[in-house]
Amino acid sequence: MPIATINPATGETVKTFTPASDAEVDAAIARAYERFLDYRHSTTFAQRAQWANATADLLEAEADEVAAMMTLEMGKTLKSAKAEALKCAKGFRYYAQNAEQLLADEPADAGKVGAARAYIRYQPLGVVLAVMPWNFPLWQAVRFAAPALMAGNVGILKHASNVPQSALYLADVITRGGFPEGCFQTLLVPSSAVERILRDPRVAAATLTGSEPAGQSVAAIAGDEIKPTVLELGGSDPFIVMPSADLDEAVKTAVTARVQNNGQSCIAAKRFIVHTDIYDAFVDKFVEQMKALKVGDPTDPATDVGPLATESGRDEIAKQVDDAVAAGATLRCGGKPLDGPGWFYPPTVVTDITKDMALYTEEVFGPVASMYRAADIDEAIEIANATTFGLGSNAWTNDAAEQQRFIDDIEAGQVFINGMTVSYPELGFGGVKRSGYGRELAGLGIRAFCNAKTVWIGSSKSGDAGGGSKVE
């Protein structure tokens, strides 16, 4: 895949970039490693917080310009892109305010371990490689960058090849915010370069957000090198609606949850599992609202759904829908790519889906909603868990006992009750099963690339850890 900005609304190649050479990659790694050796000791939390807040200021001041860039590169609506830029600022501010507390020493009961003092100290690991996707060009990377930099790590970003301008902007704005040169660098390289970077002994760890095959590849390399990783992979999130729910509010939120970011979000609701007593009413209302969405130019403020980011992505969801309909599924609306330039696919609703269809088993990365009828809560949970993924989930019910069942029994990294799955700096984010492992954001995210070092300090009168016979 070329490293280029290709406008998905027109298919026009706007700008191409020359990939970094092997020598440039080596120089970037060396620069990052040398910077880390100094940065981890010479900077305080207060200094890093000042730079993080300054970076947030720039993101806010440049939000309109940044939004236009993201819209040009991957097709999200301008209003969505601006919200993303502002969310990035919020992420930097959160860690500027909270990093020192989140990484404070955790005292242990020294007496129980025969010590004068004992505690856990969190220290940065070093150079962290971030392999990031195109769907949230800045926010996905900031979820790593803000906590990593505040913890004392340094980062190298290998971004998706279709968002090079976003990738370069992020490194630039972080440096303009005051972080020393080399703390955060973007390398415009193909995916084939990831192995070489990750195997370099100066690179301590990796984080990846992307497809399952990409995650498997990075995990295999990191495992061979014994390097820690965080993987945030695909999702096929359920959106369950029970009879006690506010139906109109559930439908409204469900539509938003499906078409957010033009349907290209790992945590977008994709499978709508509705109790049989309200199934027909829910589907009718949902279809009506999906039909009313405006598809078109993502720079038009009136547009609800823009193009898919890539031609191959548009073709993939078209095939998933076509194959399902050919096998007996029912198309309630949408279902055909729009004529004309660009990679547009309309909001689509499919019912009567069976287990042998790709719509049932695969992630659908576009504005396509799959509908399922459930006889009771047991069947709803069974359908929700009948996937290899386990990223986010949504359940709508005002019954407290049902809420607890969903919290306890849905196999996912996140359960949102009477709402839609959203990432917040204040909440840990990640999945289970084939949606990955490890966590981003909040305290879990900043500690993900820290050495949790156990510290045991004996009294000056005793060098015997444990005070007598010891068992490892």
From Swiss-Prot:
Reaction(s) this enzyme catalyzes, per UniProt: succinate semialdehyde + NADP(+) + H2O = succinate + NADPH + 2 H(+)
Biological processes annotated in GO: tricarboxylic acid cycle
Catalytic residues as annotated in Swiss-Prot or TrEMBL: 232, 266
EC number: 1.2.1.79
Summary of the function given for this chain in its UniProt record: Catalyzes the NADP(+)-dependent oxidation of succinate semialdehyde to succinate. It is believed to be the main source of succinate semialdehyde dehydrogenase activity in Mycobacterium.
Xref: NCBIfam families: PRK09406.1 (NF006915)
Record protein name field: Succinate-semialdehyde dehydrogenase [NADP(+)]
